Each structure stands twice: as structure tokens, then as C-alpha cells.
Regions:
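Ribokinase/PfkB-type carbohydrate-kinase core domain
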Residues: 1-25, 86-100, 112-251
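Glycine-rich phosphate/adenosyl-contacting loop at the front of the ribokinase-like
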Residues: 1-75, 80-84, 261-262
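Conserved phosphate-binding/catalytic region of the ribokinase-like
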Residues: 2-19, 212-321
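Short, conserved phosphate/pyrophosphate- and ester-handling motifs at nucleotide-, phospho-/glycolipid
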Residues: 63, 202, 268
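Hydrophobic residues at beta-strand termini and immediately following loops
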Residues: 73, 121, 254-255
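Short acidic/glycine-enriched loop/turn segments that link adjacent beta-strands
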Residues: 103-106
């Protein structure tokens, strides 16, 4: 059923609503680890690859490959890492609205365990050094979908980004807090939620959000209470169990697409990219989440987080589903 619906939706993807992606482009050094290091240990890693990544860049790539045009505000610096990122973006047909910042881009070490679980250690760069001059360069059209990552919102520039968001008219923020949901100060988090964003959380992040907002940790009750408290849409991703969505109009659980997990790097980013592509095409939230599930299932079945599929690859992957 999901595969048949996906085959109906993919030809409908087209840019009907403007999208702007605000966030980071960084380098991911990915290595296999037989176990996570413990204090005082010295373990041997097997390097998989050095990939261009970052939540916002993964989403920009996913949107581009699905045929959705977006404005990409991904600060690029002047160092070695920045040049690698710039070249990779050029190959994807992407440009950044914020280029030639002073300093280099950040990077992270991703350790992948035998079961595919990943652990990140991050080093910040220009992607977390937002300022008013950069923001003044951005023209956000009315009715835009506006993506933010929790990594930037939890950084020292988070308050500046929220202040900018609060001044925008008629936009729909899409926020993937990621693991930083527990690091954003209460006052700033309240201001973010007052903007009525569409929030996407994974299982662990939903538990943290429930505790922070004094809501139920049971998914369906959480979704109902979320609507009552914030009057804003919510997506809760449950890996192989699919994804729940909640809005003022409807709620439900969209099944996951079957896949063989290789690693889960970029799973949440790619899901967000699929959802944004659906929403930008005018699809209802349920169909957008279905598209997000399909894109995420492809990405976790391949190495690295920057391997989002094209429409044709999705069609072939799920032709018998």
C-alpha cells in the first residue's frame, strides 16, 4: 500500500512553496568501531570514508535530488574543510547564500558500531558563527518553509537566529532539534515554540521533549497534548516502526519501508528532506511523512548520510512494495 502511494506521489513533486534551509555544512569522518571507546582505552578504528555532511547540507542534497529548489544558507569558510564542502556542493548543483566567511567549517568523527548505531564527536566552525550581517543577506519569501537544526539553535548564535525568525512574516518553521533538544535554554525554547514550528523528533528526543514540557511520554498522548499546548504539527520517528504525525487536522502512523540497515548516519536529516519536499509540493502532512520514510529507508541502507536518492532510485527501490 505504501509503495503504491509512493509511486503516485513522486511524479507530483514540484516546487510550489518556497524553501530555505538554514544550518550547517561540515565534514564527517566516518569510522567503524567494534565498540565505543571507554575511558583510558586505545582502540583501533577502520576508516570508512570522509564525507561532506551536516544536517542542513544533507537536507539540501535530498531536496535537490527530489527536484525541489531551495535557498541554502549554509555558511562556508576559507579553510581546507570549507573548500572540500564547496567543491562537493558544486557537483550537486548547490550554492550557499553565505560564502567566504572567516575561518574554516567544522567537522565531526562518527563512530559506527557493528549494529549500525552511530556516535558523533563534533568540532564547530563557521557554521555556528551566525551574525546579523549574514542574516541581512537572506530574503525569505512569504509562505516559505524554513528549516532549522537544533545544533545551531543550541549554539551561542541560537538566540540571534530565533530573534530573526520572530521577525519574519508568514513562514512555517521546520525544526529538527536532534540530540541538542536538551541543551536549549528554557526561555529560548519557549520562544521557538511560540513560532508554532513543525517539529520532528526521534524516539529518544520525544522522551526528552515530553519531560521538558511536562507531557506524556506515550506517543499518541504526547501528540494530543502537543497540539493542545502548542497548536503546531509534530512528527515522531520510530525507526522500523514507522513515524507518527500529529496536526490540528489529522494524526496517524505511517509504516516504515523495509530495508537492510547499513548505518543510520543522516537518517533524521534525510527524513526531514523528504518531508520538506512533500510539503513544498503541496502534499498533506501524512503523504509528506510517507515520502520522508521512503527517503530515510534508502539512506540507512547505504553508507554515509549524503546519499539521498533521486525519484527514479526511489521508484526502483520500492517497485514491489
Amino acid at each position: 500500500m505504501s509503495g503504491a502511494r509512493l509511486h503516485t506521489l513522486l511524479p507530483e513533486l514540484t516546487s510550489r512553496q518556497p524553501v530555505m534551509v538554514v544550518g550547517a555544512a561540515v565534514i564527517d569522518v566516518i569510522a567503524d568501531a567494534y565498540a565505543l571507546p571507554w575511558r583510558g582505552c586505545d582502540i583501533e578504528l577502520k576508516q570508512q570514508s570522509v564525507n561532506v555532511g551536516g544536517c542542513a547540507l544533507n537536507i539540501a542534497v535530498a531536496l535537490k535530488r527530489l527536484g525541489i529548489e531551495a535557498g541554502n544558507a549554509l555558511p562556508l569558510g576559507q579553510g581546507v574543510w570549507a573548500e572540500i564542502i564547496r567543491n562537493r556542493m558544486a557537483k550537486e548543483g548547490l550554492i550557499s547564500l553565505i560564502d567566504n566567511a572567516e575561518g574554516d567549517n567544522g567537522w565531526c568523527l562518527a563512530l559506527v558500531e557493528p549494529n549500525g548505531e552511530r556516535t558523533f564527536m563534533s568540532f564547530s566552525g563557521v557554521e555556528n558563527q551566525w551574525n546579523r550581517q549574514w542574516l541581512a543577506r537572506l530574503t525569505v519569501a512569504p509562505g516559505s518553509l524554513l528549516y532549522f537544526s537544533g545544533y545551531q539553535l543550541a549554539s551561542p548564535c541560537g538566540e540571534l537566529l530565533v530573534e530573526w525568525l520572530e521577525k519574519l512574516q508568514d513562514v512555517t518553521p521546520f525544526i529538527d532539534f536532534g540530540p541538542r533538544i536538551g541543551d536549549i535554554p528554557d526561555a529560548l525554547l519557549a520562544r521557538i515554540m511560540a513560532c508554532r514550528p513543525l517539529v520532528s523528533l526521534n524516539r529518544q528526543e520525544a522522551e526528552i521533549a515530553a519531560e521538558r514540557f511536562a507531557l506524556s511520554a506515550e506517543i499518541t498522548t504526547l501528540g494530543k497534548q502537543w497540539q493542545e499546548k502548542f497548536a503546531a504539527p509534530l512528527i515522531v520517528r520510530l525507526d522500523k516502526e514507522g513515524a507518527w504525525y500529529f496536526s490540528n487536522d489529522a494524526s496517524g502512523c505511517i509504516p516504515a519501508f523495509p530495508t537492510q540497515v547499513v548505518d543510520t548516519i543522516g537518517a533524521g536529516d534525510s527524513h526531514a528532506g523528504g518531508v520538506l519536499a512533500g510539503l513544498a509540493s503541496g502534499l498533506p502532512l501524512a503523504d509528506a511523512v510517507l515520502l520522508g520514510n521512503a527517503v530515510a529507508s534508502w539512506v540507512v541502507g547505504h553508507r554515509g548520510g549524503d546519499c539521498a536518492p533521486t525519484r527514479e532510485e526511489l521508484l526502483l527501490a520500492h517497485k514491489n512494495v
